[in-house]
Amino acid sequence: MNDRRAQAYAAEGAVWARLAGLLPGADDADEVQGCWDIGEQEAGLEVLVGRLLEQELAVDDAARAELAVMAGQWGVWDRLGTGIVACRPDPARPARLRVYEDGAEPPVPAWSVLPDPVSRELRLVPWIACAGCGLVLARAHTYEEWEELSYLAQSYVVHAPGGSGAPRVFERAEDGAAWSALAVVRDGCGCG
């Protein structure tokens, strides 16, 4: 593992520990943390989201966005996205970030947002947005010949509605790409 990959993994581990800390019971939090420790992130995310829903625990918008990115990173967004979106909001903290369930907003052709050259088959699926300014983090998927979107995103695109400002593209193959894209939406728009 190269240094950059090790740093990205360590940073993701810190987010994981913070998310596990959302669970009030030490046994639950330890179970989720244990899943990270043994490399069973998919199972840990299922336990975490399941317990958040079962116990009707409040989840603020920042944690919900981190859960979404974590689920996307570990390939379980398709199974857990609905639950993540359904987690009870934290009434003590006004929501600035909104996580979209797949299908809540229609995918848009990438060529309508990104400069040329862009594949005509690439679609941007709105995923996380800033409620204040509308800045959107979208997952870029290929529209396959069988008329479905590719399972994994090729990249992450942060863009403003109406094309104000240049879009930023984060290639999935880059370490920490989804986290970097989330940071732009969370910290870079000035609404936070």
Annotate the PLM regions.
Residues 1-22:
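Short, charge-rich, low-complexity alpha-helical interaction segments
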Residues 24-30, 62:
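Alpha-helix N-cap/N′ positions at the starts of helices
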Residues 30, 46-51:
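Non-membrane alpha-helical segments in proteins
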Residues 32, 43-45, 79-80:
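Solenoid-repeat scaffolds in large eukaryotic assemblies
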Residues 36-37:
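Hydrophobic/aromatic side-chain positions at a characteristic register within alpha-helices
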Residues 50, 54-135:
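Long, charge-patterned amphipathic interaction tracts in eukaryotic proteins
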Residues 101-192:
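N-terminal accessory interaction module
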